[in-house]
Structures are given as C-alpha cells and as structure tokens.
Swiss-Prot record:
Keywords: Aromatic hydrocarbons catabolism, Lyase, Manganese, Metal-binding. Residues 6-256 form the Pyruvate carboxyltransferase domain. The keyword Methyltransferase does not apply. Mn(2+) binds at D15, H195, H197. Belongs to the 4-hydroxy-2-oxovalerate aldolase family. Substrate binds at R14, D15, S168, H195, Y286. This is 4-hydroxy-2-oxovalerate aldolase.
Length: 337
C-alpha cells in the first residue's frame, strides 16, 4: 500500500448532524472545532446534514441557523480549513456566497452520481470566490466504474480540485471501491477522495481499499457520528494509518480524547449496525426510503425489507419515492394479499 500522506476531512459537524437531528449549538461547534483543530485535523466540514440551505421541514430543521455555526467554526479554527457541503437544488448560489462571507475556505458540491452536469454553475461561483472545490458524487455504487469516471471528469472540467467517490448507502464492498478509484485515476488529473458509510460494517475497510487504489483524501467522523450506522471513525482511521506508517498529521491521543470527551456526550446512542442501517447497506437504497417503505409495508402487508430490496434492484434514487407504493402494491399482489 502507498505511504503517501492522507488528508482526512472530518465531517462530524455535517454528516454527524443527521445523527443528532441537527441539534448542534454554537458551543458544540466551538468545542469540537477547537479540539479537532488542535489535534491537527486539516479540514472540518460544518453545515446542515443535507448541506447549505438544508434546514427545512422536508430535511429537518436546524436548532441553530447554519451560518451562525459556520461563523463560529471559522472564528475558532486556527489551522484547519472550514468546509461546507452544497447540494444544487437544496442549497443555492446565495447560500454559497453567505457561507463564504461567514468564513468557509472549501465547498464540497454534491450531486447524484449520474447528474454531475447540474453542478457547473456552482463550481463556477466557488472558483470566483476563491474556494477550494470538491466534487461529491453520491450513491456512486449505482454507476459502473467507467460511467462514474465520466461524471467525475465533468466535475473536473467545471473546476473541481478533488473528486470524491461517495458510498451514500454504505453498500460498497472493498473491490467496488478499488474498481472505482482506479477508473477515476485513469481519467482525472486531480486527486481522488472517498466517503464511506458503515451500514455493512465496512467503513474502515473500504477507506483502506480506497487508499490502496490511490485515493489521497478520506472522509471520517469522530465516534463515527453520521447518518445510518455512521461514517469511517476518525480516531480509528488515524490509529490504523499510523500503524501502517501512513502520515495524516493528526495527533492520535488528542483525536481520541476529542471523540471520548467532547463528541460522545452529545450522542443519543452509539453508532451501530442495527437492522435498519443493515437493510440500507444490503439493498443499496437511500436511507430516506426506509420510513416510507415501513409505511407502505404496513399498508400492504409486506415486509419493508422486501420493498427496499426491490427498489434496489430497480435502481431507485432520491426523488423516486413514489415508486415505493407501486412496489409494495406489486409485492402484495404477487403474494395474493
């Protein structure tokens, strides 16, 4: 495995927001950013779990307005870059400008893996604002490695400084990750990143697979705090990479203490691979489908796991929630209910 230094981007204050129902306070942000910054974490992502502009009835209301949290993070950090996530269609160029004014130095622009073309204007503005830019290809398992590489190439052409393979459903196996990193390396001139979810218990393993294949930017979250079963655990990743002789620039004891004494007390429960998360990882569908599948399953007398398996087979993506009732009805009819 290569010994090239790995840049870890910590997403506790963004993906972790999902796990605590977007209840971060300014004091939480101050304490977490200070601890991560002092430990040597180079990039800290701060925003609503669904990115800039995500606070809404649809995606969940933030306890504290995200621009206040970003401003607090930027004011607190001494060395780490403050980043924010932006999903075109949820966040707008207006929110991106506001986030820049509040102190972000990096924006991670996320699209469905097959829809990179919707990000062109956002990358354009980000470059005008002087931000480091990251392309974030979500649900990356849904395209072949070669198809994903072409979407990554689009993001690079729009101005992405890094392109991330994002395992949004936590469904990839290590070889899936390796194949996609290799495919991107063949066509890109910019570095590659990987964002894992732990729904199959493979977040650390998949992150190592990405590094083995040539990724140099890896997302992680202290205590693994994130959607579903969480993300690659920052302190564990730092320890493993240290054992392997791979430099991260992060002090292991300090990041362990940040997770133990600052992040853990904020958690409602530990991040575990429970039945719901495992179902998402196994079926490879969006976690937002789960609640709807449970409702449809109750209505039609069908196990919601069967609904999700069929949705995965049909390659349903976010925005196709209307398929859920159709699938439940079809399964019920097939069983003669």
């Amino acid at each position: 495995m290569p010994k090239q230094a790995i840049r870890i981007m910590d997403t506790t204050l963004r993906d972790g927001s999902h796990a605590i129902r977007h209840r971060f306070t300014k004091e939480n942000v101050r304490q977490i950013v200070q601890a991560l910054d002092e430990a040597g974490v180079p990039v800290i992502e701060v925003s609503h779990g669904d990115g800039l502009g995500g606070s809404s009835l649809q995606y969940g209301m933030s306890l504290v307005e995200e621009m206040e949290l970003i401003e607090e993070a930027a004011k607190t950090s001494r060395r780490a870059k403050i980043a924010a996530l932006l999903l075109p269609g949820i966040g707008t160029k207006k929110e991106l400008q506001q986030a820049k004014d509040c102190g972000i130095q990096m924006v991670r622009i996320a699209t469905q893996c097959s829809e990179a073309d919707v990000s062109e204007q956002h990358f354009g503005l980000a470059k005008e604002l002087g931000l480091e830019t990251v392309g974030f290809l979500m649900m990356a398992h849904m395209l072949s490695p070669e198809e994903l590489a072409q979407q990554a190439k689009l993001m690079e052409s729009y101005g992405a400084d890094i392109v991330y393979i994002v395992d949004s459903a936590g469904t990839m196996l290590p070889q899936d990750v390796i194949d996609r990193v290799i495919a991107l390396k063949k066509v890109l001139n910019v570095p590659i990143g990987f964002h894992a979810h732990n729904n199959l218990g493979l977040a650390i393993g998949n992150s190592l697979a990405a590094i083995q294949a040539g990724a140099t930017n890896i997302d992680a979250s202290t205590r693994g705090l994130g959607a579903g079963s969480g993300n690659t655990q920052t302190e564990v990743l730092v320890a493993v990479l240290s054992r392997m002789g791979i430099e991260t620039g992060i002090d292991l004891f300090q990041i362990m203490d940040a997770a133990e004494y600052i992040v853990d007390p904020l958690m409602d429960s530990p991040m575990i691979v429970n039945r719901d998360a495992l179902t998402i990882g196994f079926t490879g569908v969006y976690s937002t489908f789960l609640w709807h599948a449970k409702q449809a399953g109750e209505k039609f007398g069908v196990d919601p796991r069967e609904i999700l398996i069929e949705l995965g087979r049909r390659k349903a993506v976010a925005g196709q929630e209307d398929w859920i009732l159709d699938v439940a009805s079809d399964l019920s009819s097939a069983k003669g209910r």
